[in-house]
């Protein structure tokens, strides 16, 4: 009987193949251990620059390091975190509230800018200018306790839906921005919202939707 002994060339090929398999397995394990920090973002220079910025900021001992108690990230809301079409969500809430409150304010039927809202006359409302807008916001945001106003906001958001997507407005948030908020927080940033919308309208739901506390 003769035993076939592989030649040195074959042994080298087998050894190299085994090394390649180990290297590929290690690479796959390494990738699995490092989840994508911004999974809904397309790979590209914008995503890379965000990740690189955060890595610089959190790297102790580097010129770019920022202590955790000084890390903040500030976001706009309308058009940045959620949809602003076909109109600002708070404005839709305000006009609906004017129509509901008008049942106890019959004089609004003849007073501008309330008359314009009740008749859906957006040109007349636009012509009322900043002063008209202020009157509407004062009428809808005053005369109630903080808790009562919060309840009215939450009830409205629970029942009203986007005319095109037929989904609650709080569902129409941008997932990439939610990923970004979460990524900053995981790296010690405190997140804030600066918006043209009123804080009374936003505070009741920003914690649930964005993870941003109502402070």
Region spans (language model):
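Bacterial N-terminal signal peptides
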Residues: 14-27
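Short, low-complexity interaction segments enriched in Ser/Thr/Pro/Gly
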Residues: 6-7, 17, 31
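Alpha-helical substrate-recognition element adjacent to the catalytic core
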Residues: 32-215
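N-terminal secretory signal peptides that target proteins for export/translocation
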Residues: 1-13
